[in-house]
Amino acid sequence: SDFQDVAAFLGAGGQRGPQRRILREGTYAINLVQFVVITEERVYSLPLSRQDEEIVRAMATFISERQGFRPVVIKDTDDQVGIVTVHDGPSLPQGEIIAPVVGDSAADEATYHNKFQDADRFLLAGGLRGRQLQVLVEGTYYINRLFATVEMIQKTIIEVGTVGVVVSYTGEVGEDLSGDEYR
């Protein structure tokens, strides 16, 4: 649904408040009695109370601060990856700091979230709130920034003639092989 069928929205358990699904470019016949649509250029709505207008304006500012009106674009020449932090869903288990990869198989239509572009499928796949193990690489991604934010970081480059030592913050607790002199 593109929010054009109010009865279908409500019949499918639609709830009040910001929606996980976003609208991409196009023309939509949306009932503005039921919905407010916030874009970079304007807010589409029927007249709102002063309080509701302030809430919508604050939300538009918040989305704008997260660059939420534009897709995430990562070019090969940027030498960057996108670190995703999800702001919805169940919390990580105690002691964990990075959420595992879920819903990454296009073969499973029910849970394939296509790199966080379908928030409902991400959550259906068991996705957790917090920083994600799965990163974004070259491509264009239409992600609801109320659902998830993306921090761009430089790719790691190990110069010729040098090495990089890797320390993992995920996985099972391993045996410390560094020796007593390291401590």
Language-model features: where?
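Interfacial loop/beta elements and low-complexity acidic/Ser/Thr-rich segments
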Residues: S1-R183
